[in-house]
Amino acid sequence: MIRYMSALEIKSRPFISSFIVALALTGIVSRDVCGQTKPDSRGAKSIAAIRAVLDAQVSAWNRGDIEGFMDGYWRSPETVFASGDTVTRGWQTVLERYKKSYDTREKMGTLTFSDLEIQLISKDAAVALGRWQLTRGSDTPHGRFTLIFRRTAPGWRIVHDHTSSA
């Protein structure tokens, strides 16, 4: 029997949390290891749903709708956003960070995601790796992101975001 740990249990055990993230990021837990070389229909639907979340985020961002962009994140105090040397915890705090950092349309620019790789690590969890870029009048910041998604009541949501700038 497989026992799934809650996020709180994982968070309280740093070794387990680090181990799970390491597994997810290195791809040790993959469909090939499980003996599946092609995603089944449920897996394909999950990947499509995750892509739809990311597409909706890009659309919201490019409309200047930060709250719409944040709909892709789990509305929980356990949501984590890591960037640079800063870790922000909680959906509301992440929203406030975005609003402070991108308080004008000029600062928001036009967002694109590319080189997306989405891997299911269980029926209710997935990892997405990709590139982001903002096209603005004065510059073009860009970088990489790794997102951990969880299937929640409203659908797939980002529970952990690690974004870096190039």
How would you name each of these model-derived features?
Residues 2-19:
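Bacterial N-terminal signal peptides that target proteins for export
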Residues 17-28:
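Bacterial N-terminal signal peptides
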Residues 33-72, 76, 93:
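Short, low-complexity N-terminal intrinsically disordered segments enriched in polar/charged residues
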Residues 48, 66-121, 133, 140:
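A solvent-exposed, acidic/Ser-Thr-rich amphipathic alpha-helical stretch
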Residues 118-126, 150-155:
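A short, structured loop/turn motif at beta-sheet edges
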Residues 134-135, 165:
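Short, surface-exposed beta-strand-loop junctions and turns on beta-sheet-rich folds
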Residues 142-166:
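Short beta-strand edge/turn micro-motifs at domain boundaries
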